[in-house]
């Protein structure tokens, strides 16, 4: 009877543990990134009343006689199933769809979590606003003017420096893709202003110097009266400026005498054939271009406050790309249809400020600058474990690496089984209330049954005590 008492006590104690876990699950039903717990029971040791006997020629075998001495908690598991995603529309809210944990830095310690309600602090760091833990990843580095993210490097704090500057870049390449009407009238000798205007097609586009100054590139095209399928082009920079910019124009390493004129020749199919100048320079490559040089206005160049000497280059050279020989797309053409103006690309830009940012499914943070540039600022890292169930809970919906979880495998999204990141959403708790209420009923009945075992054993002891009377 004493055995049944202690068995009943173990039932009470361990069903209370299960009830504690259920209560914690229910209380965290709306906790972002929470992972529910689950209690598994196992029986305790058993007392051997009689051992087993081997069968022989005369009798069969005898099974052992054992009395169980109660039960205990086998495991308290953390169930890392996917929680449902809730859209928030907040760009710093991140959810993981699939495997992985966000990596935080709390002092010298690494923490891991599925809760992605992030924000920016005063320094522009991406943090968990509730505790200041900094989100880890890889910050972009500028190499030759391009933003590069090295995901093989050590992870670091992620910064989104809203308001920071994107330095200006001078134009070095301009790409034309306009059509010149084959039926454009020739400009006769002694032409009037109206005839000159009717026989000229003009393309204008903004280009930039190294200081972010804006200049107007203008190219005037007129048909060559001496040669069919040829156009004479005149390139100028800031043609309406009070101080004309001295220019130089080179075709095939031969400079035009006037520094601005070149000849474009088309084939009978309306596509580019060659570019040349009157001095004999010619470009017959697959991609045709001329090189143009202009003086940067003195007002655009900063000067040394002591010596007054300019602190930057005073001339600038860029390539004016006309297109590919024989190509119809992204190249200049000559067809009997209306002339069109299209400079489809140039690689310069003025200085800009970081105005906004966005985070994509790869965790890459892209900055949107006022000058129209989009640059990578960094990438959020994810961590996976061989045994995520072995992680220790660290409070504040975080986990800590343990000796049984394995070492964190930190990498970029989508690599080695890592999930993807959903921006503007949060992962909700994976607690199912219907399941928890069912477990609560079962646990309550188990607790009641264990208490009834104690009551019945007590009544039996009372009966034994009354035998003496």
PLM regions and their residue ranges:
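Acidic/polar, glycine-anchored loop/turn motif associated with catalytic or activation segments
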Residues: 450
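Generic N-terminal amphipathic, Lys/Arg-enriched alpha-helix
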Residues: 1-8
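Alpha-helical heptad-repeat coiled-coil segments that mediate oligomerization/polymerization in large
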Residues: 8, 12-15, 30-41, 429, ...
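N-terminal membrane-targeting segments
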Residues: 462-466
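N-terminal glycine-rich anion-binding loops that anchor highly charged ligand groups
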Residues: 17-21
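Small/polar low-complexity and glycine-rich loop motifs
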Residues: 2, 35, 39-439, 446
